[in-house]
Amino acid sequence: MPKKLKIKLVKSPIGYPWDQKDTVKRLGLRRMNQVVIKDDCPQIRGMIRKVRHLVEVEEVEEGGNEA
């Protein structure tokens, strides 16, 4: 099964450069502790790498019961 990434915003992007704020928004994260599930692809991995100090990432199996 393809992998998915569970991404959680754990630190506010306030005070960080605009490009990092924009990356957080493009990942679909709007609020603290919000979780989104994204496909594991190079583009998403690159976005995560850019804001790795603001998010927590966990790999999950597609179709799993994790929320």
Swiss-Prot record:
Gene Ontology cellular component terms for the protein in this record: cytosolic large ribosomal subunit
A molecular function (GO) term: structural constituent of ribosome
Keywords for this protein: Ribonucleoprotein, Ribosomal protein
Lineage top rank: taxon: Bacteria
Matching CDD domains: Ribosomal_L30
One Gene Ontology biological process: translation
Keyword Zinc: no
Subunit structure: Part of the 50S ribosomal subunit.
Protein name, entry field: Large ribosomal subunit protein uL30
